[in-house]
């Protein structure tokens, strides 16, 4: 009887740990998936049609985007104070990649996967907006931008966070 209880408790503990850490065999954050590649293709279509160079997907920039996503997730789930959120965002914007400074940034939270809202038409609208002080505008408008990182994740409240960063 004692062994059965021990096995049952161990199994329950393993199951609980699996649920808490989301170790179910599938990654919670995608790397370069079809969805994130589609977003980059949409950005590059707008850039090249407007005489700018296409952005290159860069692993280091994608890592920075991953860090931005983690901060956004904490904010959306109310796991971080506004003060700490601003501090972490400032720290992230100071990161350099290949000697380059951050140029553009966009984080969206949507009910469905990010590529459904970050279409070529949406990026063209951003390009045409003339909002030069907006970080998302610089993603499609900056001639200095060379690298891009895009990450997407469905968080525990069912929403999707998509982050785009350019350097």
Regions found by a protein language model. Name each.
Residues 1-10:
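Bacterial N-terminal signal peptides that target proteins for export
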Residues 6-7, 29-31:
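Short, contiguous strand/loop micro-motifs
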Residues 10-17:
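Alpha-helical transmembrane segments
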Residues 18-22:
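C-terminal motif of bacterial Sec signal peptides marking the signal peptidase cleavage site
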Residues 24-27:
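Bacterial signal peptide processing site
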Residues 31-96, 137, 145-148:
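Short, well-ordered surface patches within globular domains
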Residues 87-167:
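A well-ordered secondary-structure block
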């Amino acid at each position: 009887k004692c062994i059965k209880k021990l096995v049952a408790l161990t199994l329950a503990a393993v199951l609980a740990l699996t649920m808490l850490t989301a170790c179910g065999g599938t990654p919670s954050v995608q790397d370069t998936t079809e969805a994130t590649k589609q977003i980059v293709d949409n950005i590059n279509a707008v850039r090249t049609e407007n005489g700018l160079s296409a952005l290159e997907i860069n692993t280091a920039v994608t890592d920075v985007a991953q860090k931005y996503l983690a901060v956004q997730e904490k904010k959306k789930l109310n796991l971080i104070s506004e003060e700490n959120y601003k501090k972490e965002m400032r720290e992230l914007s100071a990161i350099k990649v290949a000697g380059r400074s951050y140029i553009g940034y966009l984080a969206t939270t949507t009910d469905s996967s990010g590529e459904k809202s970050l279409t070529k038409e949406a990026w063209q609208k951003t390009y045409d907006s003339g909002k030069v002080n907006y970080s998302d505008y610089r993603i499609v408008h900056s001639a200095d931008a060379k690298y891009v990182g895009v990450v997407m994740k469905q968080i525990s409240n069912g929403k999707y966070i998509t982050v785009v960063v350019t350097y």
